[in-house]
Amino acid sequence: MKCFFPVLSCLAVLGVVSAQRQVTVQEGPLYRTESSHITIWCNVSGYQGPSEQNFQWSIYLPSAPEREVQIVSTVDSSFPYAIYTQRVRGGKIYVERIQGNSALLHITDLQARDAGEYECHTPNTDERYFGSYSAKMNLVVIPDSLQTTAVPQTLHKVEQDPLELSCEVATETVQHTHLSVSWLRQKGGENPVEVISLSRDFILHSSSEYAQRQSLGEVRLDKLGRSTFRLTIFHLQPSDQGEFYCEAAEWIQDPDGSWYAMTRKRSEGAVVNVQPTDKEFTVRLETDKRLHTVGEPVEFRCILEAQNIPDRYFAVSWAFNSSLIATMGPNAVPVLNSDFAHREAKGQLKVAKESDGVFVLKIYHLRQEDSGKYNCRVTEREKTVTGEFIDKESKRPKNIPIVVLPLKSSISVEVASNASVVLEGEDLHFSCTVRTVGRLQARFSVIWQLVDRQNRRSNVMWLDRDGTLQPGSAYWERSSYGGIQMEQVQPNSFSLGIFNSRKEDEGQYECHVTEWVRAVDGEWQIVGERRASTLVSITALETGFAVTAISRTPGVTYSDSFDLQCIIKPHYPARVPVSVTWRFQPVGTVEFHDLVTFTRDGGVQWGDKSSTFRTRTAIEKAESSNNVRLSISRASDTEAGKYQCVAELWRRNYNNTWTRLAERTSNLLEIRVLQPVTKLQVSKSKRTLTLVENRAIQLNCSVKSQTSPNSHFAVLWYVHKPSDADGKLILKTTHSSAFEYGTYAEEEGLRGRLQFERHVSGGLFSLTVQRAEVSDSGSYYCHVEEWLLSPNYAWYKLAEEVSGRTEVTVKQPDSRLKLSQVQGSLSVLETRQIQLECVVLNRTSVASQLLVEWFVWKPNHPEREVVAHLSRDATFHYGEQAAKNNLKGRLHAESPSSGVYRLFIQNVAVQDSGTYSCRVEEWLPSPSGVWYKRAEDTAGQTAVTVMRPDAALQVDTVVPNATVTEKAAFQLDCSILSRSSQDSRFAVAWYSLRTKGGGKRGSLGIDEQEEEEEEEDISQEEDSEDPTERTVLLSVGPDAVFGPEGSPWEGRLRFQRLSPLLYRLTVLEASPQDTGNYSCHVEEWLPSPQKEWYRLTEEESAPIGIRVLDTSSTLQSLICSNDALFYFVFFYPFPIFGILIITILLVRFKSRNSSKNSEGKNGVPLLWIKEPHLNYSPTCLEPPVLSIHPGAID
């Protein structure tokens, strides 16, 4: 707690220090129109003292920006200066409080002199000064130039007819403003109804009554031209009846972003009567005025509006304060009640039917008791068959009240003036007319008084009842110079004249008339007095005094003329002198100097530095205004710069002295001396050009129009490639016809191929690229610059334009290379020669060179291999296949005629087999001399098969068997019946053929061998292995080299070649073991083209049966040598034995079925019976083997 109060005190001090007064005012500048009602808000915050703050408004006029002129205050009624006192007191300027710290300044009738810088000040209520106490903003007052006009008319329409009304809306406001236009309909005293409107944001809108019809297109608002707005209602309805007028508002955007309607105007109305197509009718009551004096007449008109009124029946009744006055039936005969019938009889009242739809009530002499409400009622009647009338619908309008005032026996005074607002220096004329009722002998005394803006009253001049004039004390001097005059024009009319008025003459002029009547005793006495006044506003000459410099041509072309206008506002009469001085600031300088001055007495004075302007400048002052025009001819750069005019306003005093009232400086007017507007047009047409290389590319650049016949042109030629971002310069020709090659021409070596030409017509330029290449393809275009000669005789570039593009495609000649596609096959024997032909049927150019390549696809090899190729210069080259297959010495190429190429392969071998074809490349020379491959084609394929000779080797197969005795020799001949080639060689080998296991039986005879072969056939069915054993006796190779002798016969063999086709092998000292089959095997060998021997085929002779007889005979040999004995002993017992076994098994099977019927059903396997397998040999005496396999017998 001890620390709390010090801290609280510190916070309080800090709060006081931190709070400071802040005054804010509406952000300016604000643009408002004359005669409008404006408001400017002002807020104050951060203050101390009472919550309700006071506000004081002041203005700083443009004529004296440093001098404060006080306007109005919420605290001090004497705060306003004299210039504003009258308007403040009259309520035309006042301050409206919004809150205690916020207020609005109201100016109800804004004047041009109200423009300036406004300051809102709040008197201090703080303990000390801290913060801001005032804020300023600018107000600009502009003329109200909005005009809304329409043709006033009355239209009679029938329901469903279309309606079109037009309204002209125009404004001359310099500032950026928006217009809103609305069409409204008004019926009598009802509030207007919006038909359709165009907002300032260009949005169409209608009220709820017309919204649906607008959405359906029944109601439209169209803008025609710049200022005409047309309303269209396509199908009128009875509810559309009324007065149509358009209302326009001009909006401007304030600095805070909000829009403000500166002024609103409405046009004259068009009354539209819509006649319904049904039985409806309307009634309205009209009278001229509602306030009357006793004795005056009044007329009431009851107007009926309906269709076909003559064919219908209506009755009318009149009422006064709900009491019946009179009735009138369809026969138009009035019937009045007793009170009004008496007045009607005296001619003071009349009830009549003026026309079919108009009924009148007239009272010729009103009484005071006639004050009240009047009305009429119209009832439609229907006539029956009997002629009687039945009332139908009845309608009555609103009551019209009138007031009848009693007569006053007094004088009345009327004051009139020649103008309510005059310009300072103009004459003021006032008339005071006295109207009397009776008292023809009365006299009047008149006093003219002036009540100024500060409500101070002063006597100007008075006339007593005896006709004596006397000026007021303040007007003695002016009256002596004739500046103030008063006159009695008629007995009841008095005038006051003030000549060469001044600003201080402004105020309320009052005519005070006193009526004097002579009494019985002859004395004059006042019986009454009346006052009347009129307000006169005198606009100071300097009010709204402004100077504006304008030019219709702020930008002029070389050598042209231009006018400068110095507009003086307002429009002063000729009596008000204004001197005008034109000043000039050349381009690039900071000081102005006087060109010429038009003095107030009409003289002309030239400035010290205007010598260059005198010969080319004309100055003229308008007779009807003080506007001064400066005309300068033959414009050049020296006349470019900023111009300004200075005006001085003078006033002539009543004593013939002069006073300079104000000086105004206009806006800066910058005149730019411009180059001429270009008319350059370059042809934009696009072209597509396709040509074959070595031709010429013709590019045209056409100037369709030019600014001047003296124009020169610089032409730049560009090419754009797809790979480049921008075009590249090829060639430039300047306006002086000089040539410059671009980087592209240098890089691509185009200098020697470019040719530029300007045609005689002058507007066509051509660029030719000779000997076009494929690399010259691209998008070509020209860039044209137009050059003119300035007034200072210097060339300048006026404009430039790019032409349309020419898409150039340079292509190589179309390929016409074509080879023969004939497919072929070729079969040859080894060592022969083959010929492969490649025929060129067509080619692109006779100047082309051909490269011919032969290749081959080998079997089981997917890739092709080059055999050889013939280059473009006719040089023969071997391919990789030639090295592989040793073709280098066997290939030969020739071309017997143009387009025919042959490849010869000599001494062919089997490995040369394959599918052969040729490929031809056609090469052409480019325009630069470089050869390039233009096309290639592949010919039809030729299948080549290289075969070895057919095998024709035959060995004698008919060889007799032989039987020799033991120790004797036997011969094995090998006879070759035919051979495949005379160059062949033979390899011969003799074999001993024995069955496996045959060694146990020893050697067999010929017959035994045959039986053994049958046995071998049976055994082959049971065993897939070869049962024969081959043993080489002797072999002789194709190179005549002997192989080793077989061991059983080693040393017992003798070889002989009896002839080239007969070979003999002799086996000496035969033994029984030599018994058996023998054969000879012959191989035929041939030499390949590479001189290598290969085996062509082989052949084997038939077996030769050799039987070597043993000197001792056995039982076995006896049985085996006798077939009948052999079958009896070894074959017949076996079938008998088999049948016996089968019979036993069948008997046993049946006995088991009878004892065990369900055994098979219980899963016990049935008896499987296999025949016994017997192994026996029909060629030997070994006993047969009986085999019974497992499971054969249970």
UniProtKB/Swiss-Prot annotation:
SMART domains: IG, IGv. It is a single-pass type I membrane protein. The chain crosses the membrane at residues 1125-1145. Residues 1-19 form the signal peptide. Its main location: membrane. It comes from the Eukaryota. This is Immunoglobulin superfamily member 3. The gene is Igsf3.
